[in-house]
């Protein structure tokens, strides 16, 4: 199907900042936004291990062409229908980011379509806003690589608080390695299921300073408790997962509530892979309701890294005139959320 009315645009989005390769197609018209396809292929490493950049990049290279063809087929479009190709510029892991950037660049040249480099964090936020309908929330962005409390002001997503060391998702993933928990479908998901069966709340440090937090010491403490358990201590892996979750999520709720009070917001939007966790959503919901507010979150199709969020955020930028030239179509491991000028919002 060919769209000739240029008040309507179609974007192909390519995401590959970590172990998920995602490709999605989105349509923007003056009256609606429509997801045409949203496909993903995940690199899963063996239990007790993480994913190495070189292996993850090889996975993305191996599956990109197939996934792109399937995304176009599901969307029922051809390359001629695509107005722009959006890709994750950063932040993320260097090798997988670069593998997808090179592939997006190749499509741009093959199809003669402009490129739009997208900030991964902004992609999460804009997709969350679209799916949930949250108007102007405080955003808790929590994933394997990022932990930030964000609010919008003067055409920037301002970071009010963040982790001072590792991300909360990285803390959970690395603890899954300690317990040799399966990485399929995701270590954080498997920790969540074990935590539901835990009953003992063990003593784990709580590290919050203002709207910032720290997780590296908490991980070290949890690792030490795991060693005690293996030596015969009277608690289970389920108790450890329960205690770790309760502690780190309480920290996230505290810094989010502080940001809500600071900016006068009654809405919370949780985005990022950790945002799928039902216990985090439950705890955040209790806090928000006590303040007369509400919490918004998406399901795993949109909170876990995906191509459609890159297509959506990229197309929002494209419609304001933004383009990424071939010479500037690089990627970067460090790309702050507040570096992006949000021209499409008032």
From Swiss-Prot:
Cofactor note: Binds 1 divalent metal cation per subunit.
Catalytic activity entry: L-threonylcarbamoyladenylate + adenosine(37) in tRNA = N(6)-L-threonylcarbamoyladenosine(37) in tRNA + AMP + H(+)
Entries under InterPro entries matching the protein: ATPase_NBD, Gcp-like_dom, KAE1/TsaD, Kae1_archaea_euk, Peptidase_M22_CS
Alphabetically ordered keywords of this record: Activator, Acyltransferase, Cytoplasm, Metal-binding, Nucleus, Transcription, Transcription regulation, Transferase, tRNA processing
SUPFAM superfamilies to which the protein is assigned, alphabetical: Actin-like ATPase domain
GO molecular function: metal ion binding; N(6)-L-threonylcarbamoyladenine synthase activity
Gene3D superfamilies: 3.30.420.40
Source organism, top-level taxon: Eukaryota
Residues annotated as binding a divalent metal cation: 120, 124, 141, 305
Binding positions (substrate): 141-145, 173, 188, 192, 277
Location of this chain's protein in the cell: Cytoplasm; Nucleus
Keyword Transcription on entry: yes
Cofactor(s) needed: a divalent metal cation
Coiled-coil spans in chain: none
One Gene Ontology term, aspect cellular component: nucleus
Leading EC class: transferase
One biological process term in Gene Ontology: tRNA threonylcarbamoyladenosine modification
EC number of this enzyme: 2.3.1.234
Family: Belongs to the KAE1 / TsaD family.
Binding partners and assembly: Component of the EKC/KEOPS complex composed of at least BUD32, CGI121, GON7, KAE1 and PCC1; the whole complex dimerizes.
Function: Component of the EKC/KEOPS complex that is required for the formation of a threonylcarbamoyl group on adenosine at position 37 (t(6)A37) in tRNAs that read codons beginning with adenine. The complex is probably involved in the transfer of the threonylcarbamoyl moiety of threonylcarbamoyl-AMP (TC-AMP) to the N6 group of A37. KAE1 likely plays a direct catalytic role in this reaction, but requires other protein(s) of the complex to fulfill this activity. The EKC/KEOPS complex also promotes both telomere uncapping and telomere elongation.
HAMAP family documented for this protein: Kae1 (MF_01446)
Name of the protein: tRNA N6-adenosine threonylcarbamoyltransferase
Organism lineage: Eukaryota, Fungi, Dikarya, Ascomycota, Pezizomycotina
